[in-house]
Regions:
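S-adenosylmethionine
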Residues: 1-451
Length: 451
């Protein structure tokens, strides 16, 4: 049993209170991100993790509460701080803060009755030694949240509050104040399910009650449990954000060509390349992640060569095309992974950019004369995108940029930069239904090696 769950062990057997287990799990998940810096997906997938004993309904509720708490963390903290004149006992984050934040999220932002959110938070506090002395504080604070909800409108209506100051500041400097605010607003909505289909996007969109994006991605607002959806077990489609599906499209016709997909797991782009008829070598340094890729390829019916190796040190020969989706800060994926904004620090960007530079040089060494190299990251930071490509082209004269035309990405001019690269933002693709809006923030550039 990991330390993450120690404080959640009840001092006496848990009673039958309906919904308590889901709230406790949500509190564990939030505390794991904020205090222990454990990614949300890592906690969800961990053997013996907080959701392991929950039924599907409670699992979904726990994830929803934790996700909402992370998306609106800045606002919720500001409200709690306003109500606690002396601050949190103990001086900061911990299980008590997680209980208050998840409780406030339910009261202010979710379709949960006030009395249920308050009483279950108090039950949590009373059940555990570390927080039992503060049960009256939990009760009073959350009752005040419910009673004073109209007083908090100005806080809740400012999207910038929910982005760490360092990150929002970078966005303002890079994209300007209005666009930074639009990005923050887009990240407040949970991302829809995006899928890449092998054929006939319109048919699948109709089957799922979704829409087809300009690039052919099918988007579904309320899909349900993914493995239970039609066509999943048959391998007719795979989950992949619309922005993440763009880089592999930039190679054009690759039928019969040898293509290396570096840093490939979990395999969405690998699947695209294989579906396009390429002979694909998929590389990843993580054997665990590579196993997941292999499972995905088997489900989809694609035959690819999977190699466990470090892309920076691999000696795999030359290829007609190389795709490098480099490890990055992932600041473009906050709408889909709300924990990212609270796990990363500004200093991480410098070290990641240096690593990307080394990987880019290594990837270039695998491109045959006349071949194509596509570099991509799911980051909004220029150091990991535009600046990375400018520096690479300055030091390697063998390569030049081959600009992307809007016609190659469904006529979507908004996402093509003046240099001919791809730059998507979370605020792109607005839709009347917020659940169908937005994209992951992505950067991609296409380079060709001289013959």
């Amino acid at each position: 049993m990991t330390k993450t769950r120690v404080w959640h062990r009840a001092t006496k057997p848990e009673g039958p209170t309906q919904g308590l287990a889901a709230r406790r799990a949500a509190t564990i998940l939030l505390d794991g991100v904020l205090r222990r810096k454990q990614p949300l997906d890592e906690q969800l997938e961990a053997e013996g993790g907080p959701l392991v004993d929950l039924d599907p309904r409670d699992r979904a509720l726990a994830r929803a509460i934790a996700g909402m708490s992370l998306r609106r963390l800045g606002s919720l903290r500001a409200i709690i701080d306003q109500l606690l004149a002396k601050g949190l006992p103990g001086g900061g984050s911990g299980p008590l803060e997680a209980m208050l934040v998840t409780g406030a999220a339910q009261i202010l932002l979710m379709d949960v009755p006030d009395h249920a959110a308050v009483s279950l938070a108090v039950d949590q506090a009373q059940a555990h030694r570390a927080t039992k002395p503060f049960a009256p504080l939990v009760n009073a604070t959350l009752r005040n949240v419910a009673r004073m909800r109209d007083d908090f409108r100005s806080i809740l209506n400012d999207p910038s509050r929910d982005v760490p100051k360092w990150l929002h500041g970078r966005r303002v400097r890079t994209y300007g104040g209005p666009q930074a605010l639009a990005i923050a607003a887009a990240e407040r909505s949970e991302a829809a399910l995006d899928i890449t289909v092998k054929s006939d996007p319109a048919r699948w969109a109709e089957a799922f009650g979704g829409i087809v994006l300009p690039t052919g991605t099918v988007r579904v607002a309320d899909a349900g449990v993914v493995p239970e959806l039609p066509g999943f077990s048959e391998g007719d489609w795979w989950v992949q954000d619309a922005a993440a599906a763009l880089p592999a499209r930039l190679f054009g016709d690759i039928r019969g060509k040898r293509v290396a997909d570096l840093c490939a797991a979990p395999g969405g782009k690998t699947a695209q390349l294989a579906a396009a008829g390429a002979a694909v070598t998929a590389l990843d340094r993580s054997r665990h992640r590579l196993q997941r890729l292999d499972e995905n390829m088997k489900r989809l019916g694609f035959d690819v060569e999977a190699v466990a190796a470090d892309a920076g040190a691999w000696n795999g020969g030359l290829f007609d095309a190389v795709l490098l989706d480099a490890p990055c800060s992932a600041t473009g994926t906050v709408r889909r992974h709300p924990d990212v904004a609270h796990l990363k620090e500004e200093k991480d960007i410098t070290s990641l950019a240096a690593h990307q530079s080394r990987l880019l040089d290594a990837a270039a060494g695998h491109v045959a004369p006349g071949g194509t190299l596509v570099y991509a990251t799911c980051s909004l930071e220029r150091e990991e995108g535009e600046n990375q490509i400018a520096a690479f082209l300055a030091r390697d004269s063998r390569f030049s940029r081959r600009p992307v035309a809007a016609s190659e990405v469904g006529g979507w001019e908004e996402i093509v930069t003046d240099d001919g690269d791809i730059r998507t933002l979370p605020s792109h693709f607005p839709h009347e239904n917020p659940r169908l809006s937005g994209l992951d923030g992505f950067f991609a550039a296409r380079l060709v090696r001289s013959s």
